[in-house]
Amino acid sequence: MKKNGCLLLFAYSLLSFSLTAATIDETYDESLFIKSFSSRYSYVSFAFEIGASTDSTHSSVFSESSFSLFPLSIARVMDECQVSELHIRATRGRWDYENWKESPDNGFYSGGLGFEVWAFMANDPSMKYWLKLTNQLSGLLCASLNYIDSSNTYQPQLSYPGSFSFSNNTQYFASLPQEDVCTENLSPLFKLLPCKRKAGIASLLDSHLFFDTDWHSFSIDVYPSENQSLASVKMGIIIQAVVDVERNGRRKGKTTFQPPSEYCHDEDMDSLHCLMSGYSTEHHTVDDLFHKVPKERCLLSSTFSDVFVSNGDKIDTFSLDEAANIQIPIQSTSDNHTVTVDRSLSNDGNHWGSLSSTIYNPSSSPRTIVYFEKFPWFVRVYLHTLTITLNGTRINTKDFIEKLYYQPLRDRKAGTMMEIQFSIPPHTNLIVHFNVEKTPLRLDEYPPDANRGYNLPPAIISVFDENNTKLCSLRTAALLMFIPTPDFSMPYNVIIFTSTVIALTFGGIFNLLTRRFVPQQSKFQNRQPSMLQRLKEKIFHKKRG
């Protein structure tokens, strides 16, 4: 009877939990986009999107634990750190605007050199939850995000509007341009996917080939899909790369060389100039890019058309089962820049420097530009030296700048942040110029290999149209700044030389100070004289007497 009562109580508890627990609806989609830039370079983009929503409108979906597709580790981090929106960018390489033209997806899913993290969270003026978030992400992504602190954290006001507005939210932004992107960062991404790398388009990714590309980037975006509510959220993971097909063929070991038929029949032609790679110059295949064909499609994905191939002005759609037979046509990239940006740094000795950014608007419409600069605390920006030149003519900055947010540095506590909003006329070349001062560091503040220089984070250019719609987000190249650095080898040489002299002299001096000198006795001194010696002594003694 007692046993039956316990079973009834257990069944009642399960029924009560099932009635009170919130229902979670989850979705998962994945797709692969391929576009050929030339006979040598192709762009690939792996997109994964996971959605989760709960029927409870008063609670956050991050507080739930019964997920099937949405990664529980991300949900726990978002819930514990009170984050409503999270964005992570990791990039290595330089996007070649001259040959590859416009950045992919208008630059919305690719960052600058190194790591970039920005988040919207509950009112957190003391950065308590922000630092907790970066430390947890550091362990989750196997990256050195724990080096983010108040000295490299900024609060932009214009560059990064949130997906939806939340009251009393605080936005933080940080970048680590010196952080490398490696296989240790890519492997945790696969663990966030429902099918990992066992099925679907993720089975095409090979870490060694991915990091051998000329440019690669990945992004993580967690954001709400409804205004003022975290009951429905989405997480997007995008992995991008520009693949060098010729180098990929050499790595695979199957590239053969044959003489072109146009001019190599001439016997006087140098044979080295007649070598041509054996890969096709008319189209690429999936095997050329990844050295493998995909496995079976991920059964958890709701889409059947998983591969999209750019073919001129149209997009061809294929299922993953047809990937082995897909031919990617080689096409020339069109020159359709919204805005072009170039940034340079001049070093005027070891103490002063100047920075110039050139922005060109090739379109026939004016563009609104938000220019976002950030510097470490040891680079002092002098705002009174800010000048703007329009088509070679220097203009009044007060009349030209529409909005300006400036965060001055605090010595060894916070860096400098500057956001400038202005409108650039059509077909106009604009130059933003200002001076900086390099602050000497203490001896223990120099990083390893200090003579290499220090990476300055890239500037971020946000472009808006007349209706205040964001068109694209551009990153400039990271700059290398040299600051006064002592000769660390001189103390090392002095220490080695001094230690050698001390070692050579210490042994002799220590021997003289500790040894006691005793005169050596003759080995015949204590021996008894023989009978013959005693007889001789007596004879000589009598003669002398």
UniProtKB/Swiss-Prot annotation:
Q: Which residues are glycosylated?
A: N168, N227, N336, N391, N467
Topology, Lumenal side: 23-493
Species whose genome carries this gene: Schizosaccharomyces pombe (strain 972 / ATCC 24843) (Fission yeast)
Pathway-wise, it operates in: Glycolipid biosynthesis; glycosylphosphatidylinositol-anchor biosynthesis
Q: What's the name of the protein?
A: GPI transamidase component PIG-T homolog
PANTHER family assigned to the protein according to its UniProt record, in alphabetical order: GPI TRANSAMIDASE COMPONENT PIG-T (PTHR12959:SF11), GPI TRANSAMIDASE COMPONENT PIG-T-RELATED (PTHR12959)
Q: What does this protein do?
A: Component of the GPI transamidase complex. Involved in transfer of GPI to proteins.
Gene assigned in the entry:
gpi16
- Which keywords are on file for this protein? Disulfide bond, Endoplasmic reticulum, Glycoprotein, GPI-anchor biosynthesis, Membrane, Signal, Transmembrane, Transmembrane helix
Identify the residue ranges that face the Cytoplasmic compartment according to the record. 515-545
Q: Which family does it belong to?
A: Belongs to the PIGT family.
| Signal sequence interval, chain numbering | 1-22
How it assembles, according to the record, is: Forms a complex with PIG-S homolog, PIG-U homolog and GPI8.
Q: Where are the transmembrane segments?
A: 494-514
Of the GO CC terms on this record, one is: GPI-anchor transamidase complex
- Modifications after synthesis and translation: The disulfide bond between PIGK/GPI8 and PIGT is important for normal enzyme activity.
Places the protein is found: Endoplasmic reticulum membrane
List, in alphabetical order, the GO biological process terms annotated in this UniProt record: attachment of GPI anchor to protein; GPI anchor biosynthetic process
Where along the sequence do coiled-coil regions lie?
none
One Pfam family from the UniProt entry? Gpi16
**Matching InterPro entries, A to Z?**
PIG-T
